Amino acid sequence: MKKKIKKLKVFWSTCSICLALKFIIILIPIICLFTHSHTQWCVGGSSLLSK
């Protein structure tokens, strides 16, 4: 199981789409904080991060 996780981590960090997704996931709550927006994106994004 640990090997699988390690492989997944390597894939996640090398895959450019994953990097873009990570960037977007990080960016959404920041944008929401600045715009004080309570759209579904913001609520969903921040609840994902707080988990």
Swiss-Prot record:
The chain crosses the membrane at residues 14-34. It comes from the Eukaryota. Keywords: Membrane, Transmembrane, Transmembrane helix. GO terms for cellular component: membrane. This is Putative uncharacterized transmembrane protein DDB_G0286493. It is found in: Membrane. It is a single-pass membrane protein.
